[in-house]
UniProtKB/Swiss-Prot annotation:
Protein origin, superkingdom: Eukaryota
Family the UniProt entry places it in: Belongs to the phosphofructokinase type A (PFKA) family. ATP-dependent PFK group I subfamily. Eukaryotic two domain clade 'E' sub-subfamily.
Pathway of action: Carbohydrate degradation; glycolysis; D-glyceraldehyde 3-phosphate and glycerone phosphate from D-glucose: step 3/4
Organism in which the protein naturally occurs: Homo sapiens (Human)
Cellular localization per UniProt: Cytoplasm
The protein, known as: ATP-dependent 6-phosphofructokinase, muscle type
Amino acid sequence: MTHEEHHAAKTLGIGKAIAVLTSGGDAQGMNAAVRAVVRVGIFTGARVFFVHEGYQGLVDGGDHIKEATWESVSMMLQLGGTVIGSARCKDFREREGRLRAAYNLVKRGITNLCVIGGDGSLTGADTFRSEWSDLLSDLQKAGKITDEEATKSSYLNIVGLVGSIDNDFCGTDMTIGTDSALHRIMEIVDAITTTAQSHQRTFVLEVMGRHCGYLALVTSLSCGADWVFIPECPPDDDWEEHLCRRLSETRTRGSRLNIIIVAEGAIDKNGKPITSEDIKNLVVKRLGYDTRVTVLGHVQRGGTPSAFDRILGSRMGVEAVMALLEGTPDTPACVVSLSGNQAVRLPLMECVQVTKDVTKAMDEKKFDEALKLRGRSFMNNWEVYKLLAHVRPPVSKSGSHTVAVMNVGAPAAGMNAAVRSTVRIGLIQGNRVLVVHDGFEGLAKGQIEEAGWSYVGGWTGQGGSKLGTKRTLPKKSFEQISANITKFNIQGLVIIGGFEAYTGGLELMEGRKQFDELCIPFVVIPATVSNNVPGSDFSVGADTALNTICTTCDRIKQSAAGTKRRVFIIETMGGYCGYLATMAGLAAGADAAYIFEEPFTIRDLQANVEHLVQKMKTTVKRGLVLRNEKCNENYTTDFIFNLYSEEGKGIFDSRKNVLGHMQQGGSPTPFDRNFATKMGAKAMNWMSGKIKESYRNGRIFANTPDSGCVLGMRKRALVFQPVAELKDQTDFEHRIPKEQWWLKLRPILKILAKYEIDLDTSDHAHLEHITRKRSGEAAV
């Protein structure tokens, strides 16, 4: 961004006013969005107003519409719900109510409205916008506003952010609040699992989501449920028979519990509701199992927002302000949404229309159509769920291949979920699946055993690495590894791990020249808390680590708020990769995050101290600074602590905290469980294809570059990239990719912490259109 453009961003909002409101059901992460809208709005020179109690406040006016300040949104990032209140409003549905709302906005000179809510709230906003000029002329005729006021407010810009735990809005992969709701559900499922196992019980869990089965579907994927009922895919007519058969099969395989997940809107093929009580009675009557029903209810809306929702809310809030301030009378009302990990702007009414089309398709019992309209990510989840839950592994292993699965590097939450789905998809495809203990070292020593279906039972929710993992690389023991590949007849290798898994893959590629046995296909699934594997925007385990850091930072901020005038310096893990420090800084509202990728000098440290000195003069008397463990070999955590302590004498005192290995532990978050499960399934499907491709004269021979890949999430899709091609994109000395997408989020972190900097927020989002899936297209 040039100096001129930076100046333009700083003055973009001068003379403009933005109102922000939250409407409809509350969702965790709404506060992060409100905070970002307020702070970025103020940064650009605009005036920002809170509208309390949703549309009701807009209609009532008066004290419900208050100007926001920088400090008024402090300490709200970690709160659930919405601080400015929300209400379902009948008045706004009537034209009379909208007329009063228009009057309240015009009188304050507000022409930009940011609405955070579900599809109903956003549709209401669009109606309001389309009537705007008529409402103004009515107000003029009635003499309530002057001609000058009418000219000044001649058009209304509207941007919507989707805040809803149901994830039922088409056009965005994730709505604000969905991830946190999944956190609440998984906490409960994990807790129920232990009691169910003790008593050999069957639990029927009912989750929220109205007419959208997203929460139920992802929950069942993340906890390995026996059955899921969702409105988009009603079960076949003989489902009672099928369900009971499945439950008794899992029991005979040795499982001590059954879990059935029911979406609150679940129906059968004829549109008749299927309730949790119906299911309980069926299981008790036919199988005689001890069965309990748990309806989760409003617990799902509560609690602290997850790191994902805080970052999502913050990113969406920034993009919303930019969309509002760049708006003209001709730009349609848009909604800021997430596609893959990119912020995009979509026309509001297109999204609302597709969302309505889903309901219409379901009313007309066109369930396939409804499923397609839900989008790529929903279809993906459904396909993987069906594979893992519904298909029985074939008994005969004729024509099967042998695939080995291993963990390499440091433990990361979600590794076990990836192993589980890899093993099970392998078995479903009729392959023999071996598991290797202790990484490449175990492969050399022959610590290899065959895994059956129940070997990986209940692994999804367990943290760490059950197979055992080591950082050892294969090069030193190629001879033993080759011997074991031959001995166990291994024809494909799935390597789940961090940077060592990737470098190990490169070494295997090199070794193919000397050892023919190494000419087998392999795929690397990135799993490391550091998120430093080239070829993927995300690694399995990073989300769990991020949430752990976030929770700790919240507690530390609380302690600092109590003692006043205190600055905490926190050291995070990640090697040379600053992902955890940056993202945790964004999610916890840090004042600064020092990372290796963005070199800093003593002058920068000095500037940060001065910034904190200024901050102590405001009502917010606390500071939080994150430092990545290897950001600078001389400016260590101790050095920064000593510098802050000395420079802050008499103004603030400092404390330091090194988080350490707690960041590798904990049970995996819903995101990591789901991501790992999908990656495992995708990797195994690729592997089966590659083995068939490389099968010649009765043996496997794969020596092409594309037979050794990293499976990674790139912007909007999961892609396989040959390890050899990724070599040029890697900084091997510092074990990081040369280009990292999240660096573009750093300016947001600084602006939200009140630094005067350039506003270049990632790849600039332009208005796009919804791409509808044709029936023949495969889900990515």
